[in-house]
Amino acid sequence: MTTTEPRTEREILDRDSVDDVDAIAEFNPDPVEIIHAVEDQAEALFTWDYSKGSRPRLDKLYEKAKVSQWNAQTDLDWSIEVDPLEAFSIFTESSNVNTGHWTEHPDSPAKNWGDKEWDQFSIESFAWRLSQFKHGEQGALLCTAKIVETVPWIDAKYYAATQVVDEARHVEVFEKYIDEKIGVRYPVNPHLQLLLDDIINDSRWDMTYLGMQIMVEGLALAAFGMMHQVTTEPLLKKLLRYVMSDEARHVAFGVLSLQEVYQDMTAKEVRERQEFAFEAGIRMRDRLLQQEVWDRMGCDVKKAVEHGLNIPDDDQIFNQLLFSKIVPNCRKLGLLDAGDGWLREKYTEIGVIELEHLEDTGEEYSTFSIEDEQLATDRS
């Protein structure tokens, strides 16, 4: 949908304010639906220009993707035993959920918890995280298939086709880990679902790129990086390393493609992309509040959300770092300061603008790549 005037925050988010607790506290209990349908407004485009390599950086990504494929069933050692509590409690500690703001504050829903409750929370929280990643990867699977259909460049179609395979593998590997090693699963968070629906529903192919390749995949890459850094569980560590090597290419695909597209856009068109980047950032912030976990732990979800929104700045580091790929990439694309710098102002308000000078993913993907020799060694 295009607009003639810049929209207000209320119009962008369809709620009273950025921190509307009632809206943010919405959560998805055990799911009823098995199939979720979203209308896809886009046209499928053929191109008769088959000139491979006319966009060299995309062609380089395509060639890299072809030799970087791995098998979720055979390239990971699924015989490794996993103790959920030992493996996952470190993520609760690293995300500052068990700090004084949650353990001692009089308004905290967890103020009376003992070790038993915190142990259960660690397992539930990690199961929720991996479940949301799995749902997000299915969203990426659908969105990338849409990019194959809608992008007008043959080099982009070629690369996007490899990403479809990557995303199928990611859904597969997260489901297998959840099923075999955790045994606890969660439905899709409504804030994530709303964002995925918006991305798929939009008719403009570059919005699919922005929503999925830059925003959703950018947050996932940052999250996987932090999880890989802190985990000592060997199966999860290797799984995340493989997934990160794919995700870095995916985000780079978005950056390299959109750089070209945005150069020729009008100020009005760029503002619409800024608004979407802001909306996506808020939706992802909202989904990080683990509404379904608090519900399963028997807490008042609205009170938990309200308490989570009031975390002191010093304890916000984990959530802020999840934007460590998004903000630099928006800067690289020129979205932060385009027009009157509206997106910079909004990212300042939600406390993530200081991440803008971290490395963007346009070329960074090479630092995450798994070389052919490493794959061969892993398989020997």
Region locations from a protein language model:
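A structural signal for well-ordered alpha-helices, especially hydrophobic packing surfaces
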Residues: 141, 171, 175-178, 251, ...
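Carboxylate/His-rich catalytic cores and anion/metal-binding grooves
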Residues: 153-183
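Short amphipathic alpha-helical segments with heptad-repeat character
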Residues: 131-134, 138, 161-164, 168, ...
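Helix-loop elements that line ligand-binding/catalytic pockets
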Residues: 239, 251-261, 278
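Terminal targeting/low-complexity segments that flank the catalytic cores of oxidoreductases
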Residues: 1-143, 149-157, 180-187, 191, ...
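Amphipathic, well-ordered alpha-helical segments in soluble domains
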Residues: 136-143, 170, 216-223, 250
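Active-site-proximal alpha-helical scaffolds that flank and shape metal-associated catalytic sites
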Residues: 176-248, 272-283
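A structural feature that tracks compact, well-ordered secondary-structure segments
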Residues: 143-147, 161-162, 221-227, 239-242, ...
